[in-house]
Amino acid sequence: MTKGLILLAAGGTGGHLFPAEALAHELRARGYSVHLVTDSRAERYAGKFPADAIHVVPSATIGSKNPVAIAKALLTLWRGYRAARSLIAGLKPLVVIGFGGYPTIPPLLAARALGVATVIHEQNAVMGRANRFLAPRVKAIAGGFLPAGGAYADKTVVTGNPVRPAVLAASETDYQPSGDGDPFELVVFGGSQGAQHFSNAVPSAICILDDVLRARLRITQQARPEDADRVKALYEKLKVPASVSPFFGDMAERIATSQMVISRSGASTVSELGVIGRPAVLVPYPYALDHDQAANAAAISGQGGAVVVPQSDLTPEKLSALLKDWMTSPAKLAQMAASARSAGQPEAAGLLADLVQTIAEGKNLKTLKDVKA
């Protein structure tokens, strides 16, 4: 017998699903049944999601100014709303919590129409479009990097971004500095969808690195499917041992055994780097509408745990110079690793579960905020 059912709404990319996965583990440990509602794009990331059931509803992103494209997207979202309403009416969840992105809009609106309590979790330092639309309509807002003030201060709780159990396990691995002649593990990734820019910039930077330093490198690089073979061939030509793939199921463990990371600065990425505690070169995605990745990066770079390099500045020469500096400064990297860890929030899943449980039990949000204060 469970305490009741909690419905999580997350989709689009792995970045939205990963914190939902972490919350699902915590809620199940507390005796709740957990279901996931997602869209077709996110199904490939949801294979190991710890839910009692996974439901797919139609969804679309409004990312075009073309009137026909907007009309098609709205029609798909309407279909998703009707499907979500039927689903929620049958499941009767205690709470529906959304993790951002357009796929969360149909289930959150359907839940509200049916009188089911709703919560949103905003991972980024800048609230995304879907969550901005939902914010005035939900009972509570949880923030990863959000400031506690603002228009919705009375219903906002800063919980941090939940990280998966694999990340918490990886955080138990101490940082190991790499001295002269020792192997130097470099991890390169661009979020769940990869980063094409890294597939060009990183091999080019390593090509102009001096031979002694290059011989120390051991690389894990996430690359898009269309780039993976080319990147792998470049490293083979340079005689640098490298694992190159569109996806690594053990990325947390690879980060834990690394000396340095090069990555985008999505909210999940920054949160995981903080919990594990690894020095990083963060390259914010330059085309984000709200520049949220730049704001996320500041959360860890401000503590001294990362260096932020705009993509326009990430030339092979700049990156090669950074690699040379860091590979010859193990004490500096060790200090950065400690600084990164100080920015981490390993307790975030528990704090978010506290919020969801408070709402599920019909308690006033002020009771939770008073406890946190």
Curated annotation (Swiss-Prot):
It comes from the Bacteria. GO terms for cellular component: plasma membrane. InterPro entries: GlcNAc_MurG, Glyco_trans_28_C, GlycoTrans_28_N. It is found in: Cell inner membrane. Pathway: Cell wall biogenesis; peptidoglycan biosynthesis. It is an enzyme of class 2 (transferase). It is a peripheral membrane protein. Pfam families: Glyco_tran_28_C (PF04101), Glyco_transf_28 (PF03033). It catalyses: di-trans,octa-cis-undecaprenyl diphospho-N-acetyl-alpha-D-muramoyl-L-alanyl-D-glutamyl-meso-2,6-diaminopimeloyl-D-alanyl-D-alanine + UDP-N-acetyl-alpha-D-glucosamine = di-trans,octa-cis-undecaprenyl diphospho-[N-acetyl-alpha-D-glucosaminyl-(1->4)]-N-acetyl-alpha-D-muramoyl-L-alanyl-D-glutamyl-meso-2,6-diaminopimeloyl-D-alanyl-D-alanine + UDP + H(+). The keyword Cell inner membrane applies. GO terms for molecular function: UDP-N-acetyl-D-glucosamine:N-acetylmuramoyl-L-alanyl-D-glutamyl-meso-2,6-diaminopimelyl-D-alanyl-D-alanine-diphosphoundecaprenol 4-beta-N-acetylglucosaminlytransferase activity; undecaprenyldiphospho-muramoylpentapeptide beta-N-acetylglucosaminyltransferase activity. Its EC number is 2.4.1.227. Cell wall formation. Catalyzes the transfer of a GlcNAc subunit on undecaprenyl-pyrophosphoryl-MurNAc-pentapeptide (lipid intermediate I) to form undecaprenyl-pyrophosphoryl-MurNAc-(pentapeptide)GlcNAc (lipid intermediate II). This is UDP-N-acetylglucosamine--N-acetylmuramyl-(pentapeptide) pyrophosphoryl-undecaprenol N-acetylglucosamine transferase. It comes from Allorhizobium ampelinum (strain ATCC BAA-846 / DSM 112012 / S4) (Agrobacterium vitis (strain S4)).
